[in-house]
């Protein structure tokens, strides 16, 4: 990033943290602010410059003063609570528990245009909320949801009841929402169809319907290609596939001994696993299991996009549009040099840019410069 671009971004972030932009400032205060470790990344020409961390604050005012004077590119605080959060060594901090966090990021879910990625991740968020509140006993009021300012959402559970959970307990939770480790035997065993059992049966039913709809030769080739399934077994299965579909709905336990159904539902069988994945909430497992994680501070700016990390209630999610509601900079024109042709929606308008010099609204200019897609060419 060129020096002029760095200075442009520093100036705009300075204006935000110092209240020169309507609705600006990072006023949100996490639970027990004084027990959190804080970390910061800054706009710098030194590509090797790392995070400045092991910092603690005694009050919201002290944090606000730091943001105003230091103007960080990224602001993080620990999901963990510590007796001595500012200690330079992790062993000296004295861990006292941690919030449970789910990270939904497009980088792990889908690639494509920015607005498409954001819409897709939002679908995962709704699935996660449904599982947490409908199946795992958490109330909507327990959830602290933030747009990450980048390509996804963070869901916090800042509850005393989960604060002391270790990594294994947190892994069990994230494995549930992501559908990891589902057992064919337990999914087919007699019991009420709900939660993952219902989703599993739906995925298997869809896969059986897909196979039944294939040309006979293609279906036979697919089934005989499954581990342990001969062409003879596959042919016999195809003759009775409608009966298998009926059993899945009425007496699924009778399919426990069916070699072909078991092979179809094998964890290595990609078509069926794609059906499971589409019904899962694709949370990033390492984030949830990490009991000493740093997470983005709501109200701060994301140095990779220039957008705000926005707290959102469950009831606001449907209407929330990150490319409008998380954008803090306005429509003042700036001139940028784009690295390539692109099309980008922001603030309710779609902008088509060509490689080279373009005059764009400041909101888009900040975004492109933060993303490394463009450099400032004038217009501060």
Swiss-Prot record:
| EC annotation from Swiss-Prot or TrEMBL | 2.7.7.-
Q: Quaternary structure?
A: Heterodimer of a small subunit (PriS) and a large subunit (PriL).
Which Gene3D superfamilies does the entry link to?
DNA primase, PRIM domain (3.90.920.10)
Presence of the UniProt keyword Manganese in the record: yes
The entry assigns this protein to a family as follows:
Belongs to the eukaryotic-type primase small subunit family.
Name the UniProt key words of this record, in alphabetical order: DNA replication, DNA-directed RNA polymerase, Magnesium, Manganese, Metal-binding, Nucleotidyltransferase, Primosome, Transcription, Transferase
State what protein this is by name. DNA primase small subunit PriS
**Keyword Chaperone in record:** no
HAMAP family from the xrefs?
DNA_primase_sml_arc
Entry cofactors: Mg(2+); Mn(2+)
Gene Ontology CC terms: DNA-directed RNA polymerase complex; primosome complex
Any single biological process term in GO = DNA replication, synthesis of primer
Q: Which residues form the active site?
A: 103, 105, 284
* Any Pfam family: DNA_primase_S
GO-annotated molecular function: DNA-directed RNA polymerase activity; metal ion binding
UniProt function note: Catalytic subunit of DNA primase, an RNA polymerase that catalyzes the synthesis of short RNA molecules used as primers for DNA polymerase during DNA replication. The small subunit contains the primase catalytic core and has DNA synthesis activity on its own. Binding to the large subunit stabilizes and modulates the activity, increasing the rate of DNA synthesis while decreasing the length of the DNA fragments, and conferring RNA synthesis capability. The DNA polymerase activity may enable DNA primase to also catalyze primer extension after primer synthesis. May also play a role in DNA repair.
């Amino acid at each position: 990033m060129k020096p002029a671009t760095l200075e442009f971004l520093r100036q705009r972030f300075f204006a935000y943290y110092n209240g020169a932009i309507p609705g600006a400032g990072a006023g949100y205060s996490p639970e027990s602010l004084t027990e959190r470790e804080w970390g910061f990344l800054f706009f710098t020409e030194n590509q090797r410059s790392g995070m400045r961390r092991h910092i603690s604050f005694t009050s919201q005012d002290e944090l606000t003063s730091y943001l105003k004077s230091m103007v960080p590119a990224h602001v993080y605080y620990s999901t963990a609570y510590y007796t001595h959060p500012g200690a330079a060594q992790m062993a000296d901090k004295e861990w006292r528990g941690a919030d449970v966090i789910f990270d939904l990021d497009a980088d792990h879910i889908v690639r494509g245009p920015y607005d498409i990625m954001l819409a897709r991740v939002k679908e995962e968020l709704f699935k996660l909320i449904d599982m947490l509140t409908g199946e795992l006993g958490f109330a909507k009021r327990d959830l602290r949801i933030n747009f990450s300012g980048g390509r996804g959402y963070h869901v916090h559970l800042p509850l005393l009841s989960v604060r002391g959970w270790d990594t294994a307990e947190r892994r069990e939770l994230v494995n549930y929402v992501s559908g990891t480790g589902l057992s064919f035997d337990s999914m087919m065993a007699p019991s009420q169809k709900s939660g993952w059992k219902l989703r599993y049966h739906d995925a298997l039913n869809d896969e059986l319907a897909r196979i039944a709809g294939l040309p006979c030769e293609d279906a036979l080739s697919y089934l005989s290609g499954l581990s342990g399934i001969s062409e003879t077994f596959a042919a016999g299965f195809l003759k009775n596939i409608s009966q298998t579909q009926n059993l899945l709905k009425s007496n699924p336990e009778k399919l426990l001994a069916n070699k072909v159904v078991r092979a179809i539902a094998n964890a290595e069988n990609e078509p069926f696993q794609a059906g499971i994945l589409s019904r899962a909430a694709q949370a990033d497992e390492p984030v949830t299991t990490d009991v000493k994680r740093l997470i983005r501070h709501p109200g701060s700016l994301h140095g990779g996009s220039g957008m705000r990390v926005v707290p959102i209630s469950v009831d606001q999610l449907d209407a929330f549009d990150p490319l409008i509601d998380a954008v803090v900079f306005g429509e003042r024109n700036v001139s940028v040099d784009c690295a390539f042709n692109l099309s980008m929606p922001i603030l309710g308008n779609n902008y088509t840019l060509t490689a080279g010099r373009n005059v764009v609204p400041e909101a888009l200019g900040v975004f492109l410069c933060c993303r490394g897609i463009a450099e400032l060419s004038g217009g501060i």
